[in-house]
Every structure is written in structure tokens, then in C-alpha cells.
Design a protein with these regions (language model features):
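Basic/aromatic-rich interaction segments and small domains that mediate binding to polyanionic partners
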Residues: 1-27, 31-111
């Protein structure tokens, strides 16, 4: 369990401490690389959907993990290396990594 919960515990709020706990869990359990999609900013207001290969997570000493953006992933789109908020990518499939990303995104988007 990512946050040390049992099946009947309520989900805790998103805060710095819980984000670090979730980061440790994902670092130990995700299998990289995996495929995803994300919306890449282009200019001020435009975004385009791009395929993405997720290759890892930035360490807490490489970026700020906060309640606004959460855990930051790293990877490559067809054009360049990119860093992105992990909760903003879309994963498909039933692999354990895909389920972990969807669970994290659900918690991050609904408990902050």
C-alpha cells in the first residue's frame, strides 16, 4: 500500500509528507520505461496531445514536490526529453505500473 493504509482506512490529504511517502513507494514499485500520453504546452494557450515514454521520477532533491504539481516524472516525447506532473499523464493497460499511476492521479486530484 502506497501510504501504509489498510483497505478500510480513509485516504489522507495531499501534503508534502504524504507526497514524499508516495514518491518512495512509486520509486520502489514502478517498472520503467512505460508508455503514456500527455498534453504538451505549445505557446501560451495551446496544448497538443503527445505520446510519451516515462523513464523515471525526479528525486525530491532535483525538484520541489508540492501540492500544486505533485510528483514529477521524466521521460521522452517524440521531440525531446520532458519533465511533467505525474498526475497529468494518461496511461492505458492493466500492468501494475499503469494501475499505480492511475491510483496516484486519483488520490492527488481528489484529496488536495
Amino acid at each position: 500500500m502506497a501510504l501504509g493504509l489498510t483497505h478500510d482506512d480513509p485516504l489522507p490529504e495531499v501534503n508534502h509528507k504524504n507526497l514524499l511517502t508516495y514518491h518512495r513507494y512509486l520509486t520502489r514499485n514502478l517498472v520503467f520505461p512505460f508508455k503514456a500520453r500527455y498534453e504538451k504546452p505549445v505557446g501560451w494557450a495551446k496544448r497538443i496531445e503527445m505520446p510519451l515514454t516515462v523513464t523515471g521520477l525526479l528525486r525530491p532533491d532535483e525538484c520541489e514536490i508540492d501540492e500544486q504539481y505533485g510528483i514529477i516524472g521524466s521521460g521522452r516525447d517524440p521531440e525531446e526529453r520532458v519533465d511533467f506532473p505525474l498526475a497529468e499523464i494518461e496511461v492505458k493497460g492493466s500492468s501494475p505500473s499503469c494501475r499505480m499511476i492511475r491510483d496516484y492521479a486519483y488520490w492527488f486530484q481528489n484529496w488536495r
